[in-house]
Every structure is written in structure tokens, then in C-alpha cells.
């Protein structure tokens, strides 16, 4: 976490003993109040949160576009200036080494990933740059970010002096903010989900505390890592290192947004194309809902069967509790990936659920009713 922001976050954490926590490779605030209240702010108002756990890598040089296009699973070659795409970095066996959002900033490409992944990604980049005109620079100590999410996000940005046009998902917009806390250059990025208002604000580290204060003054609710994790799981978004591991294949993760099948060759592409042409993988990423509200444990096995015996068909990778309902993310064998199918997790009955989950308030806990789940 940026040190300029750290003291401000500790002060605002309302005396909680665990004010700071390690989240996605960086120290950040665990909570500012009740995480359920913070989660509600993300869903019904506007939450503001530290994005110091994200790392930024710059790619320059004449070969940068061709080279990165040959490294990742999405189309960098045709990426318009000021836009980004989500992508995987694979090994030659088609397994996932990391995930990222790659942006075309004109004179450079910018790779945005978690700090917990940055060293592996940098090492992989270094290994594959041979005679290419590509320069790689880790900007993580020169560029940091704050995020806002919720239906009031655009109004909060404007209230903080950040007036932006309508942006497409993963589109960037650079401006100079002249707010009560001072003047700063920043870049605003629209979130990937077009159904939700979500923005990242990239600034130099020396400006991040005043940006934070300006957003709070405009009416945003401060949100810590615990509520962010609740929101991530409710949104059905897998996290690398937790839900996506190096042993996983791209199609198993159900993240079609990361794949482009017409872009040409890249590291691991042969395996990805073979899966596409020959049929589906044996398991898929999906959601689970407890029937009686019993907590679901990360690492638990997903079972099906009857009195005659049970068999393992999946695993839990992330879990949380919302509105008295326990929900989870994980993998299940494809033939059992049917919304509302009954399974057993650690001896408790649960349902398979399509992703993303419905809004938390509509999830039900009665064991004799099926959960209100949005179809994928």
C-alpha cells in the first residue's frame, strides 16, 4: 500500500484492531466499519477503496505490440489506443501463469496486475525478450490507484472535481483534476463490467492521499479488503492465486473474456486451440449456495451421491457470507455444472449456482427453496 495513504486509512478505520491486512500482495485496510455496511455501499451508493495492491508494468519499444500479442491470450495487435483487454499469460503447456489487463496508451503498453503476481510476470517477460525491441519497466512505485464502485460513482467523481465523459469498459481518460485538495494529473479507467459503475483513478503516489480525501468529501463510503472480497465473490470474479492456479487451463475458468481465437500464435496457444476444437474441458468454474446458511469452507470438496456412497466432483476456492446466506466459488465436473443441482459440501447440502450471483438481498436461506440466482 502507498505509504502516503497508509496513515489516513489507519486513522479512518474507527479503532478496529485489524486495521491493516495483507491483500493480493500488499498491505491495505481490512475494514473501516462493518464490512456488510461497506459492501452495501458498493452495491447501492459509492464505495472508495485502495488499489495499492495493483501493480503497473510499462512496455515500450517498436516491437512492444507484436511481442505482447505473442505472449498473452487476448488480442493486443488490434487494441485501440486508450482501451484495455483482460488476458492470461500461459506457459507452453497452456497452464495459467498469471492474469492482467493490458492497455494501449499510445507510445506504450501498460500491464495492470496484482502485486502478488508481478515478480513472476516480470521474470516471464524477461525470459521471452531475446532480440525484440521491447523495454520493460515496473511502474508500481511511480503509479498507484484508488477505485470507486456503485451506482453513484460517476456523481462522486464529479463532486471530487473529476469530470469525465461516458467511457466504454476498460477505456481510459486522462485529465487534470482541480479539486479542493489540490491539482493533480490522473487517468480514469472504466471498469470491465458494463452493468456496473466502477472506475479506477491512477495517480502519482504523492497525490493519492488528497485524492482519497476528495472522494470521501464528495460522499463516498470507505471500503476495506473484507468488503472488496465479499463483492468479488458475489460478482463471480475469480482471483489469480486463489481461484485460478498455475495448474488450471484457461477454458476451465469460464473467462471467455480473456481469450481470442483469431489473433494468431502465442505461448500456450496450441493447447487452448486443441481444447476448443476437440471439445470442452472436464470441469468448470461456478458458484455454490448453502441450503441452510452453514458456512462453506475454502478447500472443501464438493460431493454428490446417496446412502450408497458419495463421490468427489469439485472443490471450493473462495467463500463468504452475505444476507445470512453462504456463497462460494469453485470448480465442478462439467456434467454436474447445472444451476440448482444439489450437492454436498463438508456434510452440508448446497446448490450449484450460475454466476454472477444475484444481488445479496435476494439470496434466500430457506432450505426448501432454490436460491434466486442470475443465469450466466
Feature annotation, model-predicted:
Residues 202-289:
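Anionic-ligand-binding alpha/beta catalytic cores of soluble enzymes and soluble regulatory domains
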Amino acid at each position: 500500500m502507498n505509504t502516503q495513504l497508509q496513515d489516513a486509512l489507519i486513522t479512518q478505520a474507527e479503532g478496529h484492531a485489524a486495521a491493516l491486512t495483507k491483500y493480493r500482495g500488499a498491505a491495505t485496510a481490512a475494514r473501516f466499519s462493518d464490512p456488510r455496511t461497506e459492501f452495501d455501499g458498493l452495491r447501492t451508493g459509492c464505495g472508495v477503496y485502495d488499489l495499492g495492491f495493483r501493480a503497473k508494468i510499462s512496455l515500450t519499444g517498436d516491437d512492444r505490440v507484436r511481442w505482447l500479442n505473442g505472449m498473452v491470450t487476448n488480442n493486443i495487435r488490434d487494441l485501440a489506443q486508450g482501451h484495455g483487454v483482460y488476458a492470461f499469460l500461459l506457459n507452453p503447456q497452456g497452464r495459467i501463469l498469471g492474469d492482467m489487463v493490458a492497455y494501449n496508451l499510445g507510445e506504450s503498453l501498460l500491464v495492470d496486475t496484482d502485486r502478488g503476481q508481478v515478480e513472476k510476470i516480470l521474470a516471464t517477460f524477461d525470459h521471452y525478450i531475446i532480440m525484440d525491441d521491447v523495454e520493460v519497466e515496473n511502474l508500481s512505485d511511480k503509479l498507484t490507484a484508488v477505485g470507486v464502485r456503485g451506482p453513484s460513482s460517476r456523481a462522486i467523481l464529479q463532486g471530487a472535481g473529476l469530470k469525465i465523459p461516458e467511457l466504454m469498459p476498460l477505456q481510459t481518460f486522462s485529465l487534470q483534476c482541480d479539486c479542493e485538495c489540490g491539482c493533480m494529473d490522473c487517468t480514469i479507467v472504466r471498469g470491465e463490467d458494463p452493468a456496473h459503475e466502477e472506475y479506477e483513478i491512477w495517480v502519482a503516489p504523492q497525490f493519492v492521499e488528497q485524492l482519497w480525501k476528495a472522494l470521501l468529501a464528495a460522499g463516498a463510503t470507505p471500503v476495506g479488503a473484507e468488503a472488496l472480497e465479499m463483492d468479488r465473490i458475489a460478482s463471480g470474479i475469480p482471483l489469480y492465486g486463489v481461484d485460478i492456479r498455475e495448474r488450471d487451463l484457461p477454458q476451465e475458468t469460464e473467462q471467455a473474456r480473456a481469450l481470442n481465437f483469431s489473433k494468431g500464435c502465442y505461448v500456450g496457444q496450441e493447447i487452448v486451440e486443441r481444447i476448443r476444437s476437440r471439445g470442452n474441458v472436464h470441469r468448470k468454474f461456478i458458484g455454490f449456495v448453502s441450503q441452510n446458511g452453514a458456512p462453506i469452507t475454502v478447500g472443501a470438496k464438493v460431493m454428490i451421491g446417496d446412502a450408497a456412497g458419495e463421490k468427489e466432483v469439485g472443490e471450493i476456492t473462495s467463500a463468504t457470507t452475505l444476507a445470512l446466506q453462504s456463497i462460494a466459488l469453485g470448480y465442478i465436473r462439467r456434467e454436474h455444472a447445472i444451476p440448482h443441482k444439489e450437492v454436498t459440501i463438508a456434510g452440508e447440502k448446497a446448490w450449484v449456482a450460475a454466476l454472477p450471483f444475484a444481488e445479496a438481498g435476494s439470496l434466500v436461506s430457506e432450505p426448501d427453496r432454490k436460491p434466486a440466482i442470475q443465469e450466466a
